[in-house]
Amino acid sequence: MTDVNPQTATVNAEIRIGNHTIRFSAQFSNEAIQLHELLPFFQNITDKVVEIAIAEVIESGKRISCHSGCGACCSQLVPISKAEGAALLNLIETLPEARRSEVRSRFAKNMAALEEADPGLFDKLEKAALDHDKERIKAIGLAYFDLDLPCPFLQDQSCSIHPQRPLSCREFLVVSDPAYCAKPDPAVVENVVLPKRVSSILYNLSSRDSNSDTGFMPLIQLLASAESIQIGQPTPAPAIDWVNRFLERLGG
Protein backbone atom coordinates (compact mmCIF):
# COMPACT_ATOMS: atom_id res chain seq x y z
CA MET A 1 0.00 0.00 0.00
CA THR A 2 1.29 3.50 -0.81
CA ASP A 3 0.25 6.67 1.06
CA VAL A 4 1.11 9.83 -0.88
CA ASN A 5 1.51 13.48 0.10
CA PRO A 6 2.98 16.28 -2.05
CA GLN A 7 6.55 15.73 -0.80
CA THR A 8 6.85 12.06 0.13
CA ALA A 9 5.19 8.70 -0.26
CA THR A 10 5.13 5.96 2.36
CA VAL A 11 5.45 2.42 1.07
CA ASN A 12 4.15 -0.42 3.23
CA ALA A 13 5.17 -3.63 1.51
CA GLU A 14 4.81 -7.34 2.18
CA ILE A 15 6.52 -9.52 -0.41
CA ARG A 16 6.78 -13.29 -0.49
CA ILE A 17 10.37 -14.42 -1.14
CA GLY A 18 10.87 -18.17 -1.25
CA ASN A 19 9.29 -19.62 1.89
CA HIS A 20 9.56 -16.36 3.79
CA THR A 21 8.08 -12.87 3.71
CA ILE A 22 9.81 -9.50 3.59
CA ARG A 23 7.91 -6.68 5.31
CA PHE A 24 8.95 -3.07 5.47
CA SER A 25 7.64 0.46 5.71
CA ALA A 26 9.63 3.40 4.35
CA GLN A 27 9.18 6.92 3.06
CA PHE A 28 10.41 8.00 -0.36
CA SER A 29 10.61 11.38 -2.03
CA ASN A 30 8.31 12.40 -4.86
CA GLU A 31 11.17 14.44 -6.33
CA ALA A 32 13.07 13.15 -9.36
CA ILE A 33 16.35 11.47 -8.44
CA GLN A 34 19.02 9.36 -10.08
CA LEU A 35 18.53 5.60 -9.68
CA HIS A 36 21.87 5.20 -7.90
CA GLU A 37 20.64 7.42 -5.07
CA LEU A 38 18.39 4.53 -4.01
CA LEU A 39 21.27 2.07 -3.82
CA PRO A 40 21.18 1.78 0.02
CA PHE A 41 17.56 0.61 -0.30
CA PHE A 42 18.45 -1.99 -2.94
CA GLN A 43 21.39 -3.18 -0.84
CA ASN A 44 19.12 -3.60 2.17
CA ILE A 45 16.58 -5.64 0.21
CA THR A 46 19.38 -7.75 -1.29
CA ASP A 47 20.69 -8.52 2.19
CA LYS A 48 17.21 -9.58 3.30
CA VAL A 49 16.84 -11.90 0.30
CA VAL A 50 20.26 -13.39 1.03
CA GLU A 51 19.28 -13.91 4.68
CA ILE A 52 16.24 -15.86 3.48
CA ALA A 53 18.40 -17.96 1.16
CA ILE A 54 20.83 -18.72 3.99
CA ALA A 55 17.95 -19.73 6.28
CA GLU A 56 16.64 -22.11 3.62
CA VAL A 57 20.13 -23.57 3.15
CA ILE A 58 20.37 -24.24 6.90
CA GLU A 59 16.87 -25.71 6.93
CA SER A 60 17.99 -28.15 4.23
CA GLY A 61 20.84 -29.39 6.41
CA LYS A 62 23.65 -27.64 4.54
CA ARG A 63 25.83 -24.70 5.53
CA ILE A 64 27.38 -21.70 3.84
CA SER A 65 31.08 -22.21 3.12
CA CYS A 66 31.95 -18.53 2.63
CA HIS A 67 33.79 -16.79 5.46
CA SER A 68 35.65 -13.58 6.20
CA GLY A 69 39.14 -13.46 4.73
CA CYS A 70 38.39 -15.82 1.86
CA GLY A 71 38.96 -13.84 -1.33
CA ALA A 72 38.81 -16.79 -3.71
CA CYS A 73 35.78 -15.46 -5.56
CA CYS A 74 37.20 -11.94 -5.80
CA SER A 75 38.96 -12.59 -9.11
CA GLN A 76 35.70 -13.22 -10.92
CA LEU A 77 34.21 -11.10 -13.68
CA VAL A 78 31.91 -9.22 -11.31
CA PRO A 79 28.88 -7.61 -12.98
CA ILE A 80 27.60 -4.30 -11.67
CA SER A 81 24.58 -2.28 -12.72
CA LYS A 82 25.23 1.10 -14.28
CA ALA A 83 23.58 2.62 -11.23
CA GLU A 84 26.14 0.88 -9.02
CA GLY A 85 28.86 2.07 -11.37
CA ALA A 86 27.90 5.70 -10.74
CA ALA A 87 27.87 5.12 -6.98
CA LEU A 88 31.26 3.39 -7.00
CA LEU A 89 32.81 6.20 -9.03
CA ASN A 90 31.58 8.62 -6.38
CA LEU A 91 32.92 6.34 -3.64
CA ILE A 92 36.40 6.23 -5.15
CA GLU A 93 36.52 10.02 -5.17
CA THR A 94 35.90 10.05 -1.39
CA LEU A 95 38.85 7.76 -0.60
CA PRO A 96 42.03 9.22 0.92
CA GLU A 97 44.42 10.29 -1.82
CA ALA A 98 46.92 7.46 -1.31
CA ARG A 99 44.20 4.81 -1.28
CA ARG A 100 42.43 6.38 -4.26
CA SER A 101 45.67 6.33 -6.23
CA GLU A 102 46.26 2.69 -5.31
CA VAL A 103 42.77 1.63 -6.40
CA ARG A 104 43.06 3.52 -9.67
CA SER A 105 46.44 1.89 -10.32
CA ARG A 106 44.96 -1.57 -9.73
CA PHE A 107 42.13 -0.92 -12.15
CA ALA A 108 44.61 0.26 -14.79
CA LYS A 109 46.89 -2.73 -14.23
CA ASN A 110 44.02 -5.21 -14.58
CA MET A 111 42.69 -3.50 -17.69
CA ALA A 112 46.15 -3.60 -19.29
CA ALA A 113 46.52 -7.30 -18.50
CA LEU A 114 43.06 -8.04 -19.88
CA GLU A 115 43.71 -6.03 -23.04
CA GLU A 116 46.83 -8.10 -23.65
CA ALA A 117 45.21 -11.46 -22.89
CA ASP A 118 41.74 -11.02 -24.43
CA PRO A 119 41.09 -7.59 -25.99
CA GLY A 120 37.64 -8.59 -27.25
CA LEU A 121 36.25 -9.89 -23.97
CA PHE A 122 33.92 -6.97 -23.25
CA ASP A 123 32.40 -7.10 -26.74
CA LYS A 124 31.87 -10.86 -26.45
CA LEU A 125 30.27 -10.45 -23.04
CA GLU A 126 27.89 -7.73 -24.22
CA LYS A 127 26.81 -9.80 -27.23
CA ALA A 128 26.24 -12.88 -25.09
CA ALA A 129 24.23 -10.82 -22.59
CA LEU A 130 22.03 -9.25 -25.28
CA ASP A 131 21.49 -12.74 -26.73
CA HIS A 132 20.63 -14.03 -23.23
CA ASP A 133 23.24 -16.77 -23.79
CA LYS A 134 23.88 -17.87 -20.20
CA GLU A 135 26.27 -20.66 -21.15
CA ARG A 136 28.41 -18.28 -23.18
CA ILE A 137 28.39 -15.74 -20.35
CA LYS A 138 29.52 -18.46 -17.94
CA ALA A 139 32.34 -19.51 -20.28
CA ILE A 140 33.54 -15.91 -20.61
CA GLY A 141 33.47 -15.55 -16.83
CA LEU A 142 35.57 -18.68 -16.33
CA ALA A 143 38.08 -17.50 -18.93
CA TYR A 144 38.38 -14.19 -17.09
CA PHE A 145 38.88 -15.96 -13.76
CA ASP A 146 41.80 -17.89 -15.23
CA LEU A 147 43.59 -14.56 -15.82
CA ASP A 148 43.89 -14.15 -12.02
CA LEU A 149 43.05 -10.46 -11.81
CA PRO A 150 42.04 -9.73 -8.19
CA CYS A 151 39.37 -7.08 -7.62
CA PRO A 152 41.00 -3.65 -7.20
CA PHE A 153 39.05 -3.22 -3.96
CA LEU A 154 40.46 -6.44 -2.46
CA GLN A 155 42.80 -5.84 0.47
CA ASP A 156 44.38 -8.63 2.54
CA GLN A 157 41.92 -11.10 1.00
CA SER A 158 38.97 -9.05 2.23
CA CYS A 159 36.70 -6.51 0.57
CA SER A 160 37.80 -2.98 1.46
CA ILE A 161 34.38 -1.58 0.51
CA HIS A 162 32.32 -4.33 2.12
CA PRO A 163 29.35 -2.13 3.16
CA GLN A 164 29.15 -0.76 -0.40
CA ARG A 165 30.08 -3.96 -2.26
CA PRO A 166 28.11 -4.77 -5.45
CA LEU A 167 24.80 -6.60 -5.24
CA SER A 168 26.20 -9.52 -7.25
CA CYS A 169 28.93 -9.97 -4.61
CA ARG A 170 26.31 -10.02 -1.86
CA GLU A 171 24.37 -12.67 -3.77
CA PHE A 172 27.32 -15.00 -4.39
CA LEU A 173 27.41 -17.83 -1.83
CA VAL A 174 28.49 -21.47 -1.98
CA VAL A 175 27.82 -24.56 0.10
CA SER A 176 30.56 -26.69 -1.46
CA ASP A 177 34.13 -27.03 -0.16
CA PRO A 178 35.68 -23.54 -0.35
CA ALA A 179 38.85 -25.13 -1.76
CA TYR A 180 36.94 -25.65 -5.01
CA CYS A 181 36.52 -21.89 -5.39
CA ALA A 182 40.21 -21.55 -6.29
CA LYS A 183 39.17 -22.83 -9.71
CA PRO A 184 35.39 -22.57 -9.94
CA ASP A 185 34.45 -25.63 -11.98
CA PRO A 186 30.62 -25.69 -12.20
CA ALA A 187 30.81 -29.46 -11.81
CA VAL A 188 32.06 -29.19 -8.22
CA VAL A 189 31.19 -25.67 -7.00
CA GLU A 190 27.66 -25.61 -5.59
CA ASN A 191 26.23 -22.11 -5.56
CA VAL A 192 23.32 -21.06 -3.40
CA VAL A 193 20.27 -20.52 -5.59
CA LEU A 194 18.53 -17.35 -4.48
CA PRO A 195 14.72 -17.10 -4.56
CA LYS A 196 15.15 -13.67 -6.20
CA ARG A 197 18.14 -11.84 -7.67
CA VAL A 198 17.91 -8.15 -6.87
CA SER A 199 20.99 -7.49 -9.01
CA SER A 200 19.13 -8.59 -12.15
CA ILE A 201 16.25 -6.25 -11.34
CA LEU A 202 18.68 -3.36 -10.97
CA TYR A 203 20.32 -4.21 -14.31
CA ASN A 204 16.88 -3.95 -15.88
CA LEU A 205 16.12 -0.62 -14.22
CA SER A 206 19.54 0.71 -15.23
CA SER A 207 18.98 -0.09 -18.91
CA ARG A 208 17.92 2.74 -21.19
CA ASP A 209 17.06 0.37 -24.05
CA SER A 210 16.54 -3.36 -23.50
CA ASN A 211 17.45 -4.07 -27.13
CA SER A 212 20.89 -2.46 -27.01
CA ASP A 213 21.72 -1.81 -23.36
CA THR A 214 22.21 -4.64 -20.86
CA GLY A 215 22.13 -2.22 -17.93
CA PHE A 216 25.24 -3.80 -16.45
CA MET A 217 28.98 -3.87 -17.03
CA PRO A 218 32.04 -5.67 -15.64
CA LEU A 219 33.33 -4.01 -12.48
CA ILE A 220 36.87 -4.02 -13.91
CA GLN A 221 35.68 -1.66 -16.65
CA LEU A 222 34.54 0.95 -14.11
CA LEU A 223 37.22 3.62 -14.47
CA ALA A 224 37.83 3.08 -18.17
CA SER A 225 34.12 3.69 -18.80
CA ALA A 226 33.59 6.46 -16.24
CA GLU A 227 32.34 9.03 -18.75
CA SER A 228 29.91 6.67 -20.48
CA ILE A 229 28.61 5.51 -17.10
CA GLN A 230 27.78 9.06 -16.09
CA ILE A 231 26.03 9.99 -19.34
CA GLY A 232 24.40 6.58 -19.70
CA GLN A 233 22.40 6.68 -16.48
CA PRO A 234 18.64 6.17 -16.85
CA THR A 235 16.47 9.27 -16.88
CA PRO A 236 15.82 10.58 -13.34
CA ALA A 237 12.39 9.76 -11.92
CA PRO A 238 10.57 10.31 -8.61
CA ALA A 239 12.02 7.99 -5.96
CA ILE A 240 8.60 6.46 -5.36
CA ASP A 241 8.32 5.57 -9.05
CA TRP A 242 11.69 3.78 -8.97
CA VAL A 243 10.64 1.91 -5.84
CA ASN A 244 7.27 0.86 -7.25
CA ARG A 245 8.90 -0.38 -10.47
CA PHE A 246 11.42 -2.30 -8.40
CA LEU A 247 8.79 -3.88 -6.14
CA GLU A 248 6.69 -4.94 -9.12
CA ARG A 249 9.66 -6.92 -10.43
CA LEU A 250 10.65 -8.25 -7.01
CA GLY A 251 7.17 -9.56 -6.33
CA GLY A 252 6.54 -10.79 -9.88
Where on the chain are the PLM-derived regions?
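Short loop/turn segments that flank or connect secondary-structure elements
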Residues: 1-252
